[in-house]
Swiss-Prot record:
GO MF annotations in UniProt: transmembrane transporter binding
GO BP annotations, alphabetical order: negative regulation of anion channel activity; positive regulation of cell migration; positive regulation of protein targeting to membrane
Originating organism: Homo sapiens
ATP-binding as UniProt keyword: no
Entries under Pfam families matching the protein: M60-like_N (PF17291), Peptidase_M60 (PF13402)
Span of domain Peptidase M60: 542-841
GO cellular component terms listed in the entry, alphabetical order: cell junction; plasma membrane
Name this polypeptide is given: TRPM8 channel-associated factor 2
Disulfide cross-links: none
Family: Belongs to the TCAF family.
Gene: TCAF2
Cited InterPro entries: Class_I_gatase-like, M60-like_N, Pep_M60_3, Peptidase_M60_dom, TCAF
PROSITE patterns, sorted: PEPTIDASE_M60
Length: 919
């Protein structure tokens, strides 16, 4: 696919050394949309005046004035065009009577061309001007079935007679060429200078045309003052990126949840969740949408059977509506969900030829189920929608009731904003409000995830961005020099990262990179380095396997492995600082600084603009065994593995391995910290042995196997996405916490509450968790357990919140308020568990955590799960704990209380003393 447009351009321009354009005719600028159209002739103002495209099995060449088709000076190009359009050698060439002089040009070159009133069989090439209104359907089907169409005309005069607001939809030529993504506009084309391009010219970011989408927005939102999208589903955000696409519903941050587009002769309306297409409260909008999609026609509205609740909404307002298992040709409008791409091609042709498509869906669930896969490329809805200039993002949007966007809000458009941004970077008259700048940053990063290979419109925008960013350079951003998230610098950071991830050579973007963290004496190894990684992953989650290598900023590494490994679902990851800082107000680094690549071939070049440690990601359940991986272009990083790395080897690494980040590893935990911190660590063995002791305790309490199926990870970063630390894989912490996790003496004397708290989060399980009450409570059981059983630090000393006076104060305060469940959280909630532990020990917890791993069909609500815990714990300790939990305000169900009534009363219930005191 990558060479289709390039090869076509080469064929069209073969032997063309100049554009000998007649001076008299005034051309119209052409507007290109979709994924097939590309420019052929562009003037020095960047206006497209000749374009080519394809539709179905056929091809089109569109010329911006019919006079060009009769000009002998353009004969070399016209002959190339006819040759490229010809479906097979010797196919007939027909010329409409309106272009009779073209026959002579073609015949003089030895081509058999004849004047014909319309194209016929067998399929060949047909040449016509853009003013014929009687052959529209014939010409579309001619191209769709494999014919080649050469068409020329200008629309500015037609616009002067019929109005500029009708050009795109009603100008005769556009009724044909628009199916292939090419439109004649009412804008004059400049005739001063034309350059013969050596490669496919760039498509303009923003083209002026008379038709105003504000009229469409007004029609779609008529009679509506607010859009209440609280329909039970969590919507995705939408990306509006096509020249003829526009937003309809926006939240205060310009995040889009309803959008629409013109495409070809048809129209599309997109909702960010399918629930929006069935909710009665959305009825007025849905009626407007279907009527707008129908374009005044009275045809049938088809509703896919998966969206059957929409039918009554439409039928009760007099719309002819039927349930349909599939799209069929006799429909005027079709309504469906965005979760299957089986009919993608048919839907795209349906819209292109005049149909209306109402479609809805979210992409966040697909993204969660397909880690490592890009929703912009692989989500079925986007396979349908991308060509329309609309996409569904994996990012969610908080449902609410939003006022209809103001005209100013509705005027935001990714392409227009990018055009303004370009002007600003070029020190021209550009202006973007901060809200638009912040939105551009997010939209740009998302747009760059759409696969550009073989799509001229996307390739063109990538080229434009490369030029913009090379000209502006990358800003120096650091903790000492942060940038605001709504600044031009932040937008540059996000766009550069997205561009690099899309395949752009990082070295082009990284020149003069202001965030170099490496020693200037570091250079990639000229010799390949082979490391053996463990390809066995018995766990339920993907596992990062360290290579001990680092890729420098802006560099490429060549990774090679065996054919067996290339078919095993492995990925290469550059960088471990996986927190996405897109929502942060200030940035001390780029928002995204890691990148993953599938190793689905034996050799692959990988890169990341910001550099990073290299990992191989082994998918869950992998039984691959030892895998040799050869990497060229990386540098060794400090890496110490407990039980494998000798002290001498570590000392040598500290002298020779100068990469900015290194790792300390056991089979159960891996710590990623700056090399500067590691240089002070004379011998990593004692601290790692302590970590392994603590990890064994973590596993013991959780009733999980030890060694861990997948080592936990703690990664330090200059900035993280939430809190002082946060859980996950990896656990993230600030640089200030590094000393806390690698200094054995401090850990033994002062404790290490925060990291164990986060490890506790990673052990929490849905069955015995009651969010939001216990989210920040039960994780602390691990902190208490590790401090007491491994570090020998009593709970009262391990954290100030667990001193006896503090604990007593909290209990009294909670009971004094009537023990409201809404206040039972964090330390108050932990107290409940500590009282149980102090009475019955740790064993019931360990036993229950093990038992819960075997349970299925657990209650889905908090009340059900809390009652199950009461029942299970009571049975485990053979005491009726109902009064104890009731004292804490738990919602005990009668059947649970009755089932435990035969158990002995818990005489030592620690809550009794407080309850008696209150009486």
């Amino acid at each position: 696919m990558a060479t289709i447009a390039a090869a076509a351009f080469e064929a069209l321009m073969d032997g063309v050394t100049c554009w000998d354009v007649p001076r008299g005719p005034i051309p119209s600028e052409l507007l290109l949309i979709g994924e097939a159209a590309f420019p052929v002739m562009v003037n020095d103002k960047g206006q497209v005046l000749i374009a080519a495209s394809s539709y179905g099995r056929g091809r089109l060449v569109v010329v911006s004035h019919e006079g060009y088709l009769s000009h002998t000076g353009l004969a070399p190009f016209l002959l190339n065009a006819v040759s490229w359009l010809c479906p097979c050698p010797g196919a007939p060439v027909g010329v409409h009577p309106s272009l009779a002089p073209l026959v002579n040009i073609l015949q003089d070159a030895g081509l058999e061309a004849q004047v014909k009133p319309e194209p016929g069989e067998p399929l060949g090439v047909y040449c016509i001007n853009a003013y014929n209104d009687t052959l529209t359907a014939t010409l579309i089907q001619f191209v769709k079935h494999g014919g080649g169409l050469l068409i020329g005309g200008q629309a500015w005069y037609w616009a002067s007679q019929h109005g500029p607001d009708k050009v795109l939809s009603r100008f005769p030529g556009n009724k044909v060429t628009s199916v292939a993504g090419v439109y004649f506009t009412d804008t004059y084309g400049d005739r001063d200078r034309f350059k013969v391009s050596k490669k496919v010219p760039k498509i303009p970011l923003h083209v002026r045309y008379g038709e105003d989408v504000r009229q469409d927005q007004q029609q779609l939102l008529e009679g509506i003052s607010e859009l209440d999208i609280r329909t039970g589903g969590v919507p995705s955000q939408l990306l509006v990126h096509g020249a003829l696409a526009f937003p309809l519903g926006l939240d205060a941050s310009l995040n889009c949840f309803l959008a629409a587009a013109h495409y070809g002769r048809g129209r599309v309306v997109l909702a960010a969740h399918e629930c929006l297409l069935c909710a009665p409260k959305m009825g007025p909008f849905l009626l407007n949408a279907v009527r707008w999609l129908a374009r005044g026609q009275t045809g049938k509205v088809g509703v896919n059977t998966n969206l059957k609740d929409l039918c009554p909404l439409l039928s009760e307002h007099g719309l002819q509506c039927s349930l349909e298992p599939h799209l069929n040709s006799d429909l005027c409008v079709y309504c469906c969900k965005a979760y299957s791409d089986k009919e993608a091609k048919q839907l795209q042709e349906f819209v292109a030829e005049g149909g209306g498509l109402l479609i809805g869906g979210q992409a966040w669930w697909w993204a969660s189920q397909n880690p490592g896969h890009c929703p912009l490329a692989g989500f079925p809805g986007n396979i349908i929608l991308n060509c329309f200039g609309l996409s569904i993002l994996p990012q969610t949007l908080k449902a609410g009731c939003f006022p209809v966007p103001t005209p100013e809000m509705r005027s935001y458009h990714f392409r227009k904003a990018l055009s303004q941004f370009q002007a600003i970077l070029n020190h021209e008259n550009g202006n973007l409000e901060k809200s638009c700048l912040a939105k551009l940053r997010v939209d740009g990063a998302a747009f760059l995830q759409i696969p550009a290979e073989g799509v001229p419109a996307y390739i063109s925008l990538h080229r434009l961005l490369r030029k913009m960013l090379r000209g502006s350079g990358l800003p120096a951003v650091s903790r000492e020099n942060p940038v605001a998230s709504d600044s031009y610098e932040a937008a540059v950071l996000s766009l550069a990262t997205g561009l690099a991830h899309s395949g752009t050579d990082c070295s082009q973007l990284a020149q003069g990179l202001g965030t170099w963290t490496c020693s200037s004496s570091l250079y990639p190894s000229k010799h390949p380095i082979t490391v053996e990684i463990n390809g066995i992953n018995p766990g339920n989650n993907d596992c990062w396997v360290s290579t001990g290598l680092y890729l420098l900023e802006g560099q490429n590494a060549e990774v090679s492995l065996s054919e067996a490994a290339a078919s095993a679902g492995l990925r290469v990851q550059i960088g471990c600082h996986t927190d996405d800082l897109t929502k942060a107000r200030k940035l001390s680094r780029a928002p995204v600084v890691t990148h993953q690549c599938w190793m689905d071939r034996t050799e692959r070049s990988v890169s990341c603009l910001w550099g990073g440690l290299l990992y191989v990601i082994v998918p869950k359940g992998s039984q691959l065994g030892p895998v040799p991986v050869t990497i060229r272009g990386a540098v060794p990083a400090p890496y110490y593995k407990l039980g494998k790395t000798s002290l001498e080897e570590w000392k040598r690494q500290m002298q020779e391995n100068l990469a900015p980040w290194g790792e300390l590893a056991t089979d159960n935990i891996i710590l990623t910290v700056p090399t500067t911190n590691l240089q002070a660590l004379k011998d990593p063995e004692p601290v790692l042995r302590l970590w392994d002791e603590m990890m064994q305790a973590v596993a013991r309490l959780a009733a999980e196997p030890f060694p861990f199926r997948r080592p936990e990870r703690i990664v330090a970063d200059v900035q993280i996405s939430a809190g002082w630390m946060h859980s996950g894989y990896p656990i993230m912490c600030h640089l200030e916490s590094v000393k806390e996790i690698i200094n054995e003496m401090d850990m033994r004397s002062r404790g290490v509450w925060g990291p164990i708290h986060e490890l506790g989060h990673n052990q929490q399980r849905h069955g015995w968790e009651f969010p939001p009450h216990t989210t920040e409570a039960t994780c602390n059981l691990w902190s208490v357990y590790v401090h007491e059983t491994v570090l020998g630090i009593p709970r009262a000393q391990a954290h100030e919140a667990l001193s006896p006076p503090e604990r007593e104060r909290r209990i009294k305060a909670h009971l004094g308020k009537g023990a409201p469940l809404c206040d039972w959280n964090v330390w108050t909630a932990l107290e409940t568990y500590l009282q149980l532990q102090e009475a019955f020990g740790w064993e019931p917890f360990t036993q229950l955590f093990a038992e819960y791993q075997t349970l299925s069909h657990l209650p889905k609500d908090n009340t059900g799960r809390m009652n199950l815990w009461v029942k299970k714990f009571s049975e485990k300790v053979k005491k009726n704990l109902v009064p104890f939990f009731e004292a804490w305000g738990w919602p005990i169900q009668k059947e649970v209380a009755d089932s435990l009534a035969s158990l002995p009363e818990w005489q030592e219930n620690p809550m009794q003393v407080y309850l008696r005191a209150r009486k």
